[in-house]
Swiss-Prot record:
Organism: Nostoc sp. (strain PCC 7120 / SAG 25.82 / UTEX 2576)
Keyword Repeat appears in the UniProt entry: no
Protein localization: Membrane
InterPro entries tied to this protein: ABC/ECF_trnsptr_transmembrane
Chain segments annotated as transmembrane: 41-61, 75-95, 153-173, 192-212, 288-308
Keyword annotations: Membrane, Transmembrane, Transmembrane helix
Location, primary (coarse class): membrane
Name recorded for this polypeptide: Ycf92-like protein
Pfam families: CbiQ
Membrane-protein topology: Multi-pass membrane protein
């Protein structure tokens, strides 16, 4: 169960402070949304480019290898596994291959002159260069559609998970809250409780490590008791894990109650009366450079990344 601690899901890396840490959280949030939204209606080349950009950002930022190596390795392994499974799976299309006779009836009645013969020869050569089935050996068959679906699924898994984790890794929960609250300021005109939403977001981000720690401790306690799972059988094993899940829920509710008590002791009554001083958000030169890069990013996406 050391996997929970070795994979820093939703955890903030305090040291070392990289250039990604120093960017404005609002700029990083817009970059994150760009990664998640530019994927839609994009071609496969753009989807692969997003994966390459995420890996490149991680390497350029000089994030310690111990932080990202195992998680990126697991995600890449999962993505390649999904790619392989989806590529050899049926594509769901009952494709009719090229018919023996031309579909246009006029071709049968045309006179066989030299120009028509040359045109037909060129069309025949071009049609032979295209193959719908890319690989077929025994029960394994890879088609163009199955490969396209495999690339879509595998890249979106890596992009969604790793881009979100990279954002949480380089942005403190308080910075995320301040950035989201700043971006949501126009919603106050519609009487939307922006402060309550951002406070809930902060507490949720702070609660993620506690959940991982509780799961880690409970599973370790079960493993150290040397339970004979074969004697218990399926019904007994399910009963044990139901007890563990019940205990986990009790511990999480206890942690939440302790957090609420700590806020009450500190005089917290409501978000509007107890203002928490978040970070002073000001755009600097590096933030404007990131915004300019974002403009170039979307320009390339619109010109070259559209799905054909």
């Amino acid at each position: 169960m050391d996997l929970l601690r070795s994979l820093p899901l939703g955890l903030y890396l305090e040291q070392p402070q990289t250039w990604l840490h120093k960017l404005d959280p609002r700029v990083k949030f817009i970059w994150l949304m760009s990664f998640l939204t530019s994927y839609s209606f994009a071609n496969n080349l753009w989807r692969i480019l997003l994966v390459a950009l995420l890996i490149l950002f991680t390497l350029i930022a000089r994030i310690p290898r111990r932080v990202w190596q195992q998680q990126m390795g697991w995600l890449l392994t999962l993505s390649f596994f999904v790619l392989a499974i989806a590529a050899i799976s049926p594509d769901g299309l009952g494709v009719d291959y090229q018919s023996r006779l031309p579909t246009n009836p006029q071709v049968l009645t045309q006179s066989a002159n030299t120009n028509n013969s040359a045109t037909a020869t060129e069309q025949l050569k071009s049609s032979k260069s295209y193959t719908y089935v890319l690989f077929h050996k025994g029960p394994v068959k890879v088609t163009r559609r199955s490969l396209d679906l495999a690339v879509r699924i595998s890249t979106i898994i890596f992009t969604v998970i790793y881009s979100t984790n990279l954002y949480l890794l380089t942005t403190a929960p308080e910075e995320i809250t301040a950035g989201v609250e700043s971006l949501m300021q126009p919603l106050r005109r519609f009487k939307i409780p922006v402060t309550e939403i951002t406070l809930t977001l902060t507490l949720s981000l702070r609660f993620i490590p506690l959940v991982l720690e509780e799961v880690q401790n409970l599973v370790r306690s079960v493993m150290t008791r040397a339970i004979n799972w074969k004697k218990l059988g399926l019904k007994g094993a399910v009963k044990v894990w139901m007890i563990v899940a019940e205990r986990l829920l009790e511990n999480l509710l206890l942690r939440a109650s302790q957090m609420a008590s700590a806020m009450m002791v500190r005089g917290f009554t409501s978000p509007n009366e107890h203002r928490v001083p978040w970070h002073d958000l000001r755009l600097k030169l590096r933030d404007w450079l990131a915004i300019a890069s974002l403009t170039i990013f979307w320009g390339i996406r619109v010109v070259f990344g559209n799905q054909i």
